[in-house]
Amino acid sequence: MSKIGKCILNPNEINLILNINSQNANEIIDIAENLAKEFEQIPATKMRDFYDYVLRIDEKNENWYKELVLLKPKLAYNYGKETNRRKKEALEKLAGTFSEIIDKIDNDLNKFKNFKTFFEALVAYHKIYAKSQ
């Protein structure tokens, strides 16, 4: 299976994201802000579309993880159709990073909920740094 992009987070950062608690909350916020800067070339509306897709996943549905995994081809599609070099590079980073996070969630509902919390912070910071709306 081909993978688009390389994860720009280290394993410890991914572990923090998927295991948010009161002791590491400030680190999570820093990670979200730093990633938002990395993804500044992605239009805010596109980032919001990805976030909305994740929000629509029903945690009570036994197939929630399958729906989450389908975010990978959605990211790949957006990467593939992008013609602007800078936006494409940012989408490549996003696809690689989220692919790695999704793999680490591995059907663990609590980790998924933590990812959604992190993604909310990322989208909030991204709105500040996004180059185009």
Curated annotation (Swiss-Prot):
Coiled coil: none
GO molecular function: RNA binding
Superkingdom classification of source: Archaea
Keyword RNA-binding: yes
Keyword entries, A-Z: Antiviral defense, RNA-binding
Keyword flag RNA-binding: yes
NCBIfam families documented for this protein: cas_TM1810_Csm2 (TIGR01870)
Subunit structure: Part of the Csm effector complex that includes Cas10, Csm2, Csm3, Csm4 and Csm5.
Something else known: Encoded in a type III-A CRISPR locus.
Known function: CRISPR (clustered regularly interspaced short palindromic repeat) is an adaptive immune system that provides protection against mobile genetic elements (viruses, transposable elements and conjugative plasmids). CRISPR clusters contain spacers, sequences complementary to antecedent mobile elements, and target invading nucleic acids. CRISPR clusters are transcribed and processed into CRISPR RNA (crRNA). This subunit may be involved in monitoring complementarity of crRNA and target RNA.
Annotated protein name in UniProt: CRISPR system Cms protein Csm2
Species this protein is from: Methanocaldococcus jannaschii (strain ATCC 43067 / DSM 2661 / JAL-1 / JCM 10045 / NBRC 100440) (Methanococcus jannaschii)
